[in-house]
Amino acid sequence: IVDTQYLGALADQNAAAREKAAELSDTAVPVRVPTAVVWEAYTGLGNIAFESDATALRRLYERLLRSHSSLEMTPEVAKRAGELNGTQMNSDTRSQLDGADSVVAAHGLLLGEPVISNDSDFRDVEGLEVVTY
């Protein structure tokens, strides 16, 4: 399950992220992008000062997104993400998850698939496998 942080690293041509992408393409492991990640990435596009820069990044995101299947936010995912977000917020010891991160984590937990991210907040989610690069 792709996190926004990893998608951004791929867009930035991060060597470690590209190496992980090549490694994953050689396996039968599905690489999926939650629609919450698409929303978060495009929110970033809306914050770019120069339209030419936003257009270039939009094209890159479109290319990256075409190469992966997407995961919709179903009611089941929304419920799991909401409970997870509340649990993390109520904890004195666990990292806080933003809204998109709780959705990404919920997808990983419900599907039993790892999340690809260097975001340390995911490490505090009980039962979630996190793959770093």
Positions of the model-derived regions?
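Histidine- and aromatic-rich ligand-binding microenvironments
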Residues: 2-3, 33-34, 97-98, 119
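Active-site neighborhoods of divalent-metal-dependent phosphate/nucleic-acid chemistry enzymes
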Residues: 69-114
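Short, structured coil segments at secondary-structure junctions
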Residues: 27, 66, 125-126
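A generic structural signal for short hydrophobic patches within well-formed alpha-helices
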Residues: 7, 38-41, 78, 122-123
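Short, well-structured N-terminal submotif of metal-dependent ribonuclease cores
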Residues: 1-33, 46-62
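Acidic, PIN/NYN-like endoribonuclease modules and their adjacent C-terminal/linker elements
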Residues: 105, 109-133
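Short, hinge-like loop/turn segments at secondary-structure boundaries
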Residues: 48-52, 88-90, 132-133
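Hydrophobic alpha-helical core bundles mediating ligand binding, dimerization, or RNAP-core interactions
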Residues: 44, 61, 65, 84-85
